[in-house]
């Protein structure tokens, strides 16, 4: 069970971080500058597509996902990149995706 809500910095007040696993981060370029508008895909441990969101103008993205191993893949006109995150439980798990 995974989903991709509207992107932004603030989590909705209804999110219970003791029960929800939240994967959040930013898409950045090689200089660490935000890449807005990138498509960010959430892939499961077998590399199967699970969800996709469009990063905010400041490169922010967020997914609600189950604990486990996930690959985040960012696709943009400026380049592409992958990052792996392995949340073991509820809470916020931050990872940036660097594109090249």
UniProtKB/Swiss-Prot annotation:
Coiled coil: none annotated. There is a cross-link at residue 98 (Isoglutamyl lysine isopeptide (Lys-Gln) (interchain with Q-Cter in protein Pup)). It holds the Pfam family DUF1416. InterPro entries: CarboxyPept-like_regulatory (IPR008969), DUF1416 (IPR010814). Keywords: Isopeptide bond, Ubl conjugation. SUPFAM superfamilies: Carboxypeptidase regulatory domain-like. GO terms for cellular component: peptidoglycan-based cell wall; plasma membrane. It comes from the Bacteria. Pupylation of this protein has been demonstrated, however it is unknown if it is the product of this gene, of the identical gene Rv3118 (AC P0CG96), or of both of them. This is Uncharacterized protein Rv0814c. It comes from Mycobacterium tuberculosis (strain ATCC 25618 / H37Rv).
């Amino acid at each position: 069970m995974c989903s991709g809500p509207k992107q932004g910095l603030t989590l909705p007040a209804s999110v219970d971080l003791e029960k929800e696993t939240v994967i959040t981060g930013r898409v950045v370029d090689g200089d660490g500058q935000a890449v807005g508008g990138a498509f960010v895909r959430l892939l499961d441990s077998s590399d199967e597509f699970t969800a996709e969101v469009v990063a905010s103008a400041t490169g922010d993205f967020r997914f609600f996902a189950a604990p486990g191993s996930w690959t985040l893949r960012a696709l943009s006109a400026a380049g592409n990149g992958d990052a792996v995150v392995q949340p073991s439980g509820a809470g916020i798990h931050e990872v940036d995706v660097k594109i090249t």
